[in-house]
């Protein structure tokens, strides 16, 4: 009640924000006559002066009105387009690090030029992030005319560029590219060995186009760079052949909402019988158990032509949000291999994670982040909670006149599609263009076959023919055109109405199913009614649609039966629409929780990643890597002799033997310790340090590179093993809940212990190698050139788990584990016989 009164008196937060921008808009408009009077050269010269002023410390906010006025005039002269006042509002919103929600056709591409030019004045780089290579190249070429007119340089990051081309693109004032390319470049940079090989500058300011798609839809998809692990392709084929023997509900259960599969007791017994093993859950059989579950997922959760397609003997992932094919991307954790075995194509070798990051953590590294989209308001809470981004709805330049008709609900898929085909035929007869949105390739092809039978000419736009995407979308608004599009394929290309279409009612949007997110439905609707054009939309649903089936259609079915509805007769009322919206809200909340969980777990990894990556940068950029070597040697010697400093009386001979063995193992120095006192400690330190000095004299100028090589090589090898250990920990952490422990807290605690172990292991391995290296006086620098880790790797999408690795990394003995205690890895062996074995 109080909220409603306050809203009436003061207006909404959005309205107050927009009102507060009026003085700035007036200031920009006041500059216009002055800027219009400048020649092209004078305008360029003024931009150069502004750059100098900003470099000398003048805040960007001070130069905003003049810069925006310059960009507006430059746009008129170079592109023939003038920014409306509402577009200036969008530009200010983006500059202030917020999300600008702008309806389709309101010129988001042009709006971005305002904050891009303003922030480019700092010389620190501006990244404009799009959803695909086509849009990155198109926008860079199109808006590049404006930037070039003002004397600013533009680069484009697309798939297939080499490091030199990437360095040039990142060195430009403004860089366009896709979220994947930016993220993978960050990971690749943190696998490089020399500073001059780095391609990215520090992350300054990013504008994310279609921000909802990138920061929300793809947030569950970590970026993963992986290399090949040991081959187990024959095992996939063997397990795949056993799957038909298992019966659903009897041998296994499927949870479609959570997309998980579980074996029942009967299923476990059946598998043990056919695999000729005693216990499927024995640690020795963990790989077999994993293969069985992945094969079940491949057969019973992942559907051909919905989740993936088979093309040229390869399983290619279909992006669930855009319907586009994603060649080169592979499911990790052996799921892709299970799908290959299912489809009887060649099974490729499995992968091991080399580097990974989520989009959530990558984008939060930017000093300033903002975004644009046509639909963000439904996820405003998530943007605020996870990214600290406020969503501002920008008013349209002309009022929206599109008519959104209520949903029609049918009993079955058959009735629904027959009604759709009949309505499309009627609309086509009238000449009104129709855009039909489907949720999968399978459904788009089913509808296409039905329309062929009724003689309606049409275009199909799905992952199988996205090469013609822009061309098909550009013509979709012409009279008589019928276009079937999978999901939101074709976003970013405006559908312009052809001659005479306005009189026919504009573009009609026909949705064949509600998406689990209201935002995706709104995106489909938003293709019609751009810039004040007429248009209409309607969704057709069936009680056996996935959303309805999984999230409560029983009450509706009962209602339809009570009403005694005939076959083919739809129901259309508010209660139905409300029930559907509630189902969508439940799914959205469920997905938000999943993304939040992912972030909570990844935050643990992120803190560790930041420490390791900043250490790498420090080593790469250091002129004196030998100082790290000296520090490490001193730390190791201190730790080995620490137990003796606290002792009163004679030390235990066994303890002295252990210490001497450690000195020989890590420092390659033989000594018989008498008492472990300060004198012996200094003797060891002097001997080991002296040998490093000799090494430095022999190697001369190359010693620094040798030291850097061993330090970085050790860091990279152990970081890879640590990623694997963290994956294993993550997979099993859910079981801690059965022991009345919070899995998240346990993951943090155990993850920290593993990380401490990693730090020790990296240090010890580097010094162990450096203590044994022998360098000839005529050493060649390339002998210590590090092989390029990024040469033969794969870039992949969602990492559901990482059970695929076979090798548990060797860990330093932790003080909390006794040598006769059970090993913490879960093998059931004593620690001294397992990971405590030297």
UniProtKB/Swiss-Prot annotation:
Keywords: ATP-binding, Cell inner membrane, Cell membrane, Cytoplasm, Membrane, Metal-binding, Nucleotide-binding, Protein transport, Translocase, Translocation, Transport, Zinc
Chain segments carrying region Disordered: 781-838
Biased composition (Basic residues): 829-838
Chief localization: membrane
SMART domains, per database record: SecA_DEAD, SecA_PP_bind
Mode of membrane association: Peripheral membrane protein
Reactions the enzyme catalyzes: ATP + H2O + cellular proteinSide 1 = ADP + phosphate + cellular proteinSide 2
Top-level taxon of origin: Bacteria
Annotated Zn(2+) binding sites: 823, 825, 834-835
Binding residues for ATP: 87, 105-109, 494
Assembly behavior: Monomer and homodimer. Part of the essential Sec protein translocation apparatus which comprises SecA, SecYEG and auxiliary proteins SecDF-YajC and YidC.
Family: Belongs to the SecA family.
Function of the molecule: Part of the Sec protein translocase complex. Interacts with the SecYEG preprotein conducting channel. Has a central role in coupling the hydrolysis of ATP to the transfer of proteins into and across the cell membrane, serving as an ATP-driven molecular motor driving the stepwise translocation of polypeptide chains across the membrane.
Protein's name in the database: Protein translocase subunit SecA
Organism per entry: Solidesulfovibrio magneticus (strain ATCC 700980 / DSM 13731 / RS-1)
Organism taxonomic ancestry: Bacteria, Pseudomonadati, Thermodesulfobacteriota, Desulfovibrionia, Desulfovibrionales
């Amino acid at each position: 009640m109080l909220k409603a009164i306050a809203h009436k008196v003061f207006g909404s937060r959005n309205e107050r924000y927009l009102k507060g921008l009026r003085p700035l808009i007036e200031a920009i408009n006041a500059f216009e006559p002055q800027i219009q009077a400048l020649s092209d050269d004078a305008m360029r010269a003024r931009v150069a002066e502004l750059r100098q002023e900003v470099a000398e410390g003048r805040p960007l906010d001070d130069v905003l009105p003049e810069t925006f006025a310059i960009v507006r005039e430059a746009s008129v002269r170079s592109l023939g387009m003038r920014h409306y006042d509402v577009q200036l509002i969008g530009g200010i919103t983006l500059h202030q690090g917020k999300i600008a929600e702008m309806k389709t056709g309101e010129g988001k591409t042009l709006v971005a030029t305002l904050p891009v030019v303003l922030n480019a004045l700092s010389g620190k780089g501006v990244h404009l992030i799009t959803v695909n290579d086509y849009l990155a190249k198109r926008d860079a070429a199109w808006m590049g005319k404006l930037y070039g007119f003002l004397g600013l340089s533009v680069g484009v990051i697309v798939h297939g560029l080499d490091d030199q081309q990437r360095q040039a693109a990142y060195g430009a004032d403004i860089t366009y590219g896709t979220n994947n390319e930016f993220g993978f470049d960050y990971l690749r940079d943190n696998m490089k060995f020399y500073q001059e090989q780095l391609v990215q500058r520090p992350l300054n300011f990013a504008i994310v186009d279609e921000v909802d798609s990138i920061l929300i839809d793809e947030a569950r998809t970590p970026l993963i760079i992986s290399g090949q692990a040991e081959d187990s392709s024959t095992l996939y084929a063997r397990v795949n052949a056993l799957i038909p023997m298992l019966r659903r509900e009897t041998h296994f259960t499927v949870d479609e909402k959570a997309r998980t599969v579980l074996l029942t007791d009967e299923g476990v017994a059946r598998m043990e019988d056919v695999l000729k093993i005693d216990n499927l859950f024995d640690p020795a059989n963990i790989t077999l158990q994993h293969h069985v579950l992945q094969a079940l997922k491949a057969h019973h959760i992942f559907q051909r032509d919905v989740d993936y397609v088979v093309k040229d003997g390869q399983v290619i992932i279909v992006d669930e949000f855009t319907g586009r094919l994603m060649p080169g991307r592979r499911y990790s954790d052996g799921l892709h291999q299970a799908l290959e075995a299912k489809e009887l194509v060649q099974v490729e070798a499995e992968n091991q994670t080399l580097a990974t990051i989520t989009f959530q953590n990558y984008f939060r590294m930017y000093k300033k982040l903002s975004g644009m989209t046509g639909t963000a308001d439904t996820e405003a809470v998530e943007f605020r909670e996870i990214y600290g981004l406020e969503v501002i709805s920008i008013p349209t330049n002309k009022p929206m006149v599109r008519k959104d008709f209520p949903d029609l609900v049918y009993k079955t898929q058959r009735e629904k599609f027959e009604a759709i085909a009949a309505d499309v035929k009627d609309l086509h007869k009238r000449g009104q263009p129709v855009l039909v949105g489907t949720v999968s390739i399978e459904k788009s092809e089913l509808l296409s076959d039905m329309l062929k039978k009724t003689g309606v000419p049409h275009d199909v736009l799905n992952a199988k023919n996205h090469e013609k995407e822009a061309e098909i979308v550009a013509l979709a608004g012409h009279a008589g055109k019928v276009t079937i599009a999978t999901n939101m394929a074709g976003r970013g290309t405006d559908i312009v109405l052809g001659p005479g279409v306005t009189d026919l009612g504009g573009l009609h949007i026909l949705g064949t199913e509600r998406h689990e997110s209201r935002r995706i439905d709104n995106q489909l609707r938003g293709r019609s009614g751009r810039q004040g054009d007429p248009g209409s939309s309607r969704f057709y649903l069936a009680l056996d649609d996935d959303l309805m089936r999984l999230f409560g259609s029983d009450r509706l079915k009962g209602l339809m039966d009570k009403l005694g509805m005939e076959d083919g007769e739809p129901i259309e009322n508010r209660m139905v629409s409300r029930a559907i919206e509630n189902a969508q809200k439940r799914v959205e909340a469920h997905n938000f929780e999943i993304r939040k969980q992912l972030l909570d777990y990844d935050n643990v990894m992120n803190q560790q990643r930041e420490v390791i990556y900043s250490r790498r940068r420090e080593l790469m950029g250091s002129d004196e890597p030998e100082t790290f070597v000296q520090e490490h040697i001193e730390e190791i010697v201190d730790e080995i002799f620490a137990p003796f400093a606290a002792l009163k009386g004679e030390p235990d001979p066994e303890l002295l033997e252990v210490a001497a063995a450690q000195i020989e193992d890590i420092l390659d120095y033989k000594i018989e310790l008498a008492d472990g006192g300060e004198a012996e400690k200094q003797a060891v330190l002097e001997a080991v340090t002296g040998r490093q000095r000799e090494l430095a004299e022999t190697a001369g100028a190359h010693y620094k590179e040798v030291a850097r090589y061993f330090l970085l090589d050790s860091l990279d090898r152990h970081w890879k093993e640590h990623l694997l250990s963290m994956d294993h920990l993550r997979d099993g952490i859910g079981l801690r809940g059965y022991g009345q422990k919070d899995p998240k807290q346990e993951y943090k605690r155990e993850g920290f212990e593993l990380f401490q172990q990693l730090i020790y292991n990296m240090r010890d391995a580097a010094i162990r190698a450096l203590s044994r290296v022998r360098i000839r006086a005529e050493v060649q620098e390339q002998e210590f050139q590090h092989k390029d880790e990024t040469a033969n790797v794969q870039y992949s999408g969602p990492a559901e788990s990482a059970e695929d690795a076979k090798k548990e990394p060797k860990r330093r003995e932790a003080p909390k584990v006794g040598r006769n205690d059970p090993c913490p890895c879960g093998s059931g062996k004593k620690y001294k016989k397992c990971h405590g074995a030297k």
